[in-house]
Amino acid sequence: MAEAESCRHLVLVDAPGGPQVADIVNSLAGLATCTVVSLRWGSPAEHARRVDGLRALGPVDIIERADQVVDALLAVAAGGRPIDGVLAFSEIVSYHAAVAAAALRLPANSPQATIRLRRKDLQRQALSAAGVPCPEFAVVTDEDELEAASSRLAFPVVLKPAIGVGSLCVTRAEDRYQLAEAFARASRQYRDDPRVNGASPVFVVEEVIQGDNWHADERMGTRVSVESLLDADEIHHLAVTDKLPLAPPFREVGDVMPSGLPEQRRAEILDVTTRALRALGATSGATHTELMLTSDGPVIIEVNGRIGGGVFELLRTAAAYDMARQQARIALGERLEELPLFSGYAAFVTPQPPSGDYEILSVGGREEIAAVPGVVEVIQTKSAGAVLAKEAGTNAHTFRVLAAGREPDEFFTQLKAIEDSIQLELGPAPSRGAQEPHRV
């Protein structure tokens, strides 16, 4: 390690989500000396294992809530060791880490850009004002605002939290009665979910965007995402990622990188993404922009100020590209070192169970999935006894699977083999008991 690098001090703000702990440790090796601020999460045993892995980077300070991040980082700085950069990968803590970095005058987005990247209501307002394509919307905090939105917007609509995570509480409503029911249910669910860190239940209601399939293969979805890194106000788009159709109601099933769309179509997508990032004032770090493909061109669904789920693994597998290390370099005030060069494709798959409220009676298939040709990694995320709620969003998946290949045509063969390998038996959720037993 060079002396200049060893003298730099990077603080990693950690929580579940983003790259695995072992990958984070490998990505940051030799870049700087590290202090870790880790949010207590999961069971005591799970968090202890996570902290044990993170200790390979340096000392680990534990916090109980995400809103303690700023105080924790100021305490580290007050301890006499200057901080040269702040880094976070998890959407649970990325906002608070960005606020702390700005407070310490370190490389980061402005406070205005940071809050726009977090809150969909402020984001929609900024995009609309700049003329960036996005759906018609209304901000809703109570029944009166909900009634006004119902009168102004054209149904069907989508209800989503202004501050969301993993498709939590995202619901489609065909009429004002469904919307009222969804709002009441989502408000309760949102308050109870620990991932939102006590955020107030502010919602955005927006008109459904009619997607148009730009792909030669109709099995691919009408949404894409763009993965970007920003340094010193320069935007570097790393990849366009294709997405499978969502599982009901709005749950992610799989992503494929790089996109198989023609170059001209990709250029349209990147142009709208650049306009969105400029409208939001983003200048630093990682962004994950989701877009709907329509007959009139790409439309922004949302922009997130973080690495997208599975994106680190996709870039590593398809291009041998370490996005986490590049993001850390930017956090330390350096310029982007390189852009990815793809040698094949990679797929990140999260097969979804049936929509509803269930308890998992049994789950299996890990070894069978691992044996599918091209599968690189399998992580089982749920065990028998876990309860699945229909409002939980993408987090309902029981496995995360990373696969790779040379020709994109291989992907759907892999996908079918993965889905056929999952053995899942579901029973009624203990608290509701409304669903019939279900075997997948």
Q: Model segments located where?
A:
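A short glycine-rich, hydrophobically flanked beta-strand micro-motif that places a catalytic Asp/Glu
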Residues: 283-295, 435-436
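Peripheral (often C-terminal) accessory segments that flank ATP-dependent C-N-forming ligase machineries
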Residues: 11, 129, 328-440
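ATP-dependent carboxylate/phosphate-activation module, predominantly the ATP-grasp catalytic core
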Residues: 207-210, 216-282, 286, 304-325, ...
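ATP-binding N-terminal substructure of ATP-dependent carboxylate-amine bond-forming enzymes
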Residues: 1-113, 117-118, 144, 382-396, ...
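Conserved ATP-binding module of the ATP-grasp superfamily
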Residues: 134-135, 156-159, 176-219, 223, ...
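A conserved helix-loop-beta module that forms one wall/lid of the active-site cleft
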Residues: 103-169, 193, 202
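Short beta-strand-to-turn element immediately C-terminal to the catalytic PLP-Schiff-base lysine
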Residues: 140, 170-175, 229-231
